[in-house]
Amino acid sequence: MNYEVKKLEKSAVEVKLHLTAEEVKPIVDKVLAHVGEHAEVAGFRKGHAPKEVLMTNYKDHIESDVANDAINANFPEIVDKEKLEPVSYVRLKEINLKDDLNLTFDIDVYPQFELGNYKGLEAEKKSFEMTDDLLKEELEIMVRNHAKLEEVEDAGYKAQLDDTVDLAFEGFMDGAPFPGGKAESHLLKLGSKSFIDNFEEQLVGYTKGQEGEITVKFPAEYHAAELAGKPAQFKVKINAIKKLRQPELNDDFAKELGYASLDELKAKTKEETTKRENDRIENEYVSALLDKLMETTTIDVPVSMVQAEIQNRLKELEYQLSMQGFKMDDYLKMMGGNVETFAAQLAPAAEKKVKIDLILDRIAKDNNFEATDEELNQRMEEIAKMYGMDVPALEEELKKNKNLENFKASVKYDIVMKKAIDEVVKNAK
């Protein structure tokens, strides 16, 4: 085996691999034997086609398999000799198979970089003070979040913006109903812009039981092409009008939330708000320190690592949307984009995240930080508690999905990264 390794930009390397006829022959014979077992060639019984015929009929397939087998057999030695740390799959660029084999491929490797000085970094760290006004604001939010819709009993009451109506409707286009344009009982908050055009505003002033007809125009970019940009008429009927009624802030309200009294609720709210705000301030401070460190650390980030981070973010968004009953494509269409455009928008933040992870990983390695069994067990207990279970139950659940070891590895990684962050903070001015 002969090879050459050439450094490319973005922490990629190009490898030119040469195998002599003697070295590549066993690989070719093995691939031909496998292809020959399954190949169906006119004029020959299955499994009896000559090698020359197979090479002609299945040239691309055979060359690809030979190349992959050759890389799998020889690349580990190259990695070891050149001290490479691959972070992506091999990308084949050129295959030249005759008697001998010449391959050209590239692969992303863990970037080599000089870490900037993280000792003595400076960043502003704000302070937090809990005030009566902030407590009042937090309690008001809590009350609003526990407001309930109650039907308006006054038969003459006219619907207003911010009211919620129980609505029956049927849509027509050119006098004919269209699919998906009918409902017998749909809750709609007026002014929420949930419906197209000025549909909601036209319902202002309606009373319970009132029927009518409104005209709207579908937006030009509407997801259903057959409706996009066209006018439509809706027959409507108000089944009921509802208003949000907020509970009174008193002991009874506190007890509904599981507290002994309003005073206890206030004390707990102060405590939780103080922790939340101090955590936010700490996160902003750490982020500012890491931004400073990034300014003094040049890293040629591999494209594959950025793409992997983008994919992680897309999967997380897809999961969150599925929990709300949305499909990713439909959501992005409503936002005026698609997966490709959204991925491009995510790229700068994804690259920054990868850079920070690489910096923290280097700090962790330089300081020999590791996650102890005790730290892992403690974190597993905290996670289990979040899900309302004990550690054995959590581990059993993870085993069902064959994800226990990966999960523990991820937890260990987070522990080590936290130690690296603490090291940066400890050494800041």
Swiss-Prot record:
Keyword Cell cycle: yes
Main location per the UniProt record: cytoplasm
Compartments, record wording: Cytoplasm
EC assignment: 5.2.1.8
Catalyses which reaction(s): [protein]-peptidylproline (omega=180) = [protein]-peptidylproline (omega=0)
Gene3D superfamilies, A to Z: 3.10.50.40, Trigger factor ribosome-binding domain, Trigger factor, C-terminal domain
Domain PPIase FKBP-type: residue ranges: 162-247
Database matches in InterPro entries: PPIase_dom_sf, PPIase_FKBP_dom, Trig_fac, Trigger_fac_C, Trigger_fac_C_sf, Trigger_fac_ribosome-bd_bac, Trigger_fac_ribosome-bd_sf, Trigger_fact/SurA_dom_sf
Domain of life where this protein originates: Bacteria
Gene Ontology CC, one term: cytoplasm
GO MF term list: peptidyl-prolyl cis-trans isomerase activity; protein folding chaperone; ribosome binding
Pfam family, one: Trigger_N
UniProt keyword annotation of DNA-binding present: no
GO BP term (any one): 'de novo' cotranslational protein folding
Alphabetic keyword roster: Cell cycle, Cell division, Chaperone, Cytoplasm, Isomerase, Rotamase
PANTHER family to which the protein is assigned, alphabetical: TRIGGER FACTOR CHAPERONE AND PEPTIDYL-PROLYL CIS/TRANS ISOMERASE (PTHR30560), TRIGGER FACTOR-LIKE PROTEIN TIG, CHLOROPLASTIC (PTHR30560:SF3)
Domain remark in the UniProt entry: Consists of 3 domains; the N-terminus binds the ribosome, the middle domain has PPIase activity, while the C-terminus has intrinsic chaperone activity on its own.
Family: Belongs to the FKBP-type PPIase family. Tig subfamily.
Summary of the function given for this chain in its UniProt record: Involved in protein export. Acts as a chaperone by maintaining the newly synthesized protein in an open conformation. Functions as a peptidyl-prolyl cis-trans isomerase.
Protein name: Trigger factor
Organism: Fusobacterium nucleatum subsp. nucleatum (strain ATCC 25586 / DSM 15643 / BCRC 10681 / CIP 101130 / JCM 8532 / KCTC 2640 / LMG 13131 / VPI 4355)
